[in-house]
Amino acid sequence: TLAKSLGSGVPVGACLVNENISSKLKLNDLGTTFGGGMIAMAAVCATFEAIEQDGMIANATAVEKRSRDSLANVSGVVGVRGKGCLLGIEFDGPCKPYHEKLLNHKIITGTSSTPNVLRLLPPLCVKTDEIDLFASVISELENA
């Protein structure tokens, strides 16, 4: 199942199945109270149109590459994991000080259950210059 961001703020959920399961489902096999609501489905369509028209998938690929390249030579950064705009930056020590200092620079990041991993979860429309700013702040913090 998935839900987040499908409707750009309008509550929507989805259930994805593989081809094997899909071939066994027939029309009207499943019933829902709110399934297929017109407003929700219009929001989903508009979201997918915006993703396609604004080239957000290609942008996410560019953001991932820029993030990896920008952080490759920053001391203290052990590695970058993830795909597209959903990345985990692994440090050689706890990342909590970075998380707090980035927040002071108005850069919001996420923490992880792994204390050395900082989560970067920008929107798909993030610009590469914003990633450069993130990397430069990390570098400044590392050199401070």
Language model regions located:
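Conserved N-terminal phosphate-binding loop of PLP-dependent enzymes in the Aspartate aminotransferase
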Residues: 1-144
